[in-house]
Regions:
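Alpha-helical DNA-contacting segments of helix-turn-helix folds
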Residues: 20, 52-62, 101, 105, ...
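Amphipathic alpha-helical packing segments from all-alpha helical-bundle domains
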Residues: 107-133, 140-145, 171-182
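Helix-turn-helix
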Residues: 11, 15, 19-53, 57
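Helical hydrophobic small-molecule/effector-binding pocket
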Residues: 81-103, 110-117, 147-151
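Amphipathic alpha-helical linker/stalk segments
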Residues: 56, 60-82, 115, 119-131
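C-terminal peripheral helix-coil segments that are non-catalytic and often amphipathic
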Residues: 126-130, 163-212
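Amphipathic alpha-helical segments that line or abut small-molecule/effector binding pockets
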Residues: 78-96, 140, 144, 174, ...
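Short hydrophobic clusters on alpha-helical segments that form packing/core surfaces
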Residues: 12-20, 62, 66, 87, ...
Length: 212
């Protein structure tokens, strides 16, 4: 009878996750996970055939942690803003996990930034429709455009450090959300990407000149 494993599968995954949190997915090797646990590499391969299996479990753990942030944001009085702020906090507090989920080309089409965006979109659609009085199509367009803003800010956080304070980024999210909401409500063709650019800018600039 083989000796009883000293560590559980979950403890091995957690050790690998801690490595990913500080040094990234590429740092997860059998030797480094074993060192984190203070054992030889043998216990790892009691549960896993390859280290790629370990990395897949770490990816799933990172997704769960991200999902917890989104769920927390949805409890905010303004759910969409709450989700945006939690997204930025995730990038700020878990930069390596953010890189894994959103800045690394996925091997699986069901993973990566676009898949995460669609999943989050499904989570917040109802609250956007309710809060901003939008149809599902309008809410999805609002979410897509705001996601691009949040993703850009989060990427700056991860790649350039503390470029903006959380208060500054919260204000940016508010400003962009107001602009996008107004465009959806007032700009003909915005939702369908069929804006008459010249006519719309003439209208905007005409209003501006008329107000001076």
């Amino acid at each position: 009878m083989p000796p009883k494993a000293k560590f559980t599968k979950e403890e091995i995954i957690d050790a690998a996750l801690q490595i990913a949190r500080t040094r990234g997915m590429e740092a997860i090797t059998a030797r480094d996970v074993a060192a984190q646990l203070g054992v030889s590499t043998r216990p790892i391969f009691t549960y896993f055939s390859t280290m790629e299996e370990v990395r897949r479990e770490v990816y799933a753990s990172a997704e769960r942690l991200y999902g917890e942030r989104i769920a927390r944001g949805l409890q905010n009085r303004r759910p969409f803003l709450g989700v945006g702020v939690e997204y930025l906090r995730f990038a700020q507090e878990e930069p390596q996990l953010y890189r894994i989920l959103f800045l690394t080309r996925p091997a699986d089409a069901n993973e990566g930034a676009i898949a995460a965006m669609r999943s989050t979109q499904n989570e917040v659609r109802a609250s956007v429709m309710r809060e901003y009085k939008m149809t599902a199509r309008e809410a999805d367009r609002f979410f897509r455009d705001m996601w691009i803003v949040a993703h850009g800010l989060a990427t700056l956080l991860v790649t350039n450090g503390e470029c903006y304070s959380m208060d500054e980024m919260r204000a940016m999210l508010t400003g962009f959300s107001a602009s996008i909401c107004r465009s959806i409500k007032e700009v003909a063709g915005y939702v369908d990407d069929k804006i008459d650019r010249d006519a719309e800018f003439a209208r905007i600039l005409g209003k501006s000149e008329g107000g001076e």
